[in-house]
Regions:
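A short helix-loop-beta-strand connector motif used in the catalytic cores of GNAT acetyltransferases and
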Residues: 54-67
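Acyl-donor (CoA/ACP) binding surface of acyl/acetyltransferases
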Residues: 1-32, 65-176
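Conserved GNAT-fold acetyl-CoA-binding loop/helix
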Residues: 32-53
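Hydrophobic residues in alpha-helical segments
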Residues: 28, 37, 58-59
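A generic secondary-structure signal
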Residues: 53-54, 117
């Protein structure tokens, strides 16, 4: 059984499908995405395995890799991963919005929807999110989603072999 489908009326969080492969592969070649992520851009053929890997991650209880889709037409707008940590009761969220959907509040909506579900339905005590200190768009989206800034983690994040500072945020049940 797959993870639930969640919606706020504007966006939908759902499991990956094989039909999402081309959109995910295309978006992964975006220069801004490449600058922020270390992953090698997937080919559509290898990304088709993403649906199977997402289901395995959910079944293993290690995370929930959602596709963010437009509620009106189910078009993929980005990815949201709820990573369940080794610390029971804690999780982290990471979001990537496809270039054509940026600037429309998609990231903040997805972060809030995923965090609320984790806190309310999974009974998590804490959901964290982080952003590089120079990633103003991500910081704004996380704050707009209601996360509370906790501080700077020095040399915490690594991208392209370089360590850099990240801003740490969290949402706990009393924040809802």
């Amino acid at each position: 059984m797959g993870a639930p489908t969640l919606s706020d009326g504007e966006i939908v969080l759902r499991m990956r499908r094989a039909s999402d492969a081309a959109a995910i592969a295309r978006a992964s070649h975006d220069p801004e995405t490449r600058r922020r992520l270390d992953d090698v851009p997937p080919a559509p053929a290898s990304e088709r395995d993403g649906a199977r890997r997402a289901e395995e991650q959910w079944s293993a209880g290690t995370g929930v890799p959602f596709v963010i889709a437009d509620a009106s037409d189910d078009r993929p707008l980005g990815l949201l991963n709820l990573q369940l940590g080794d610390d029971e009761g804690a999780a982290s969220l990471a979001v990537s919005v496809f270039p054509e959907a940026r600037g429309r509040g998609v990231a903040s909506r997805a972060l809030r929807l995923g965090a609320e579900w984790g806190l309310r339905e999974l009974g998590l005590a804490r959901v964290a999110a982080e952003a590089a200190v120079d990633n103003d768009a991500s910081i704004r989206a996380i704050e707009k989603a209601g996360f509370v800034r906790e501080g700077i983690l020095r040399a915490h994040c690594e991208t392209h072999g370089e360590r850099h500072d990240c801003v740490m945020f969290s949402l706990v049940p009393s924040d809802l």
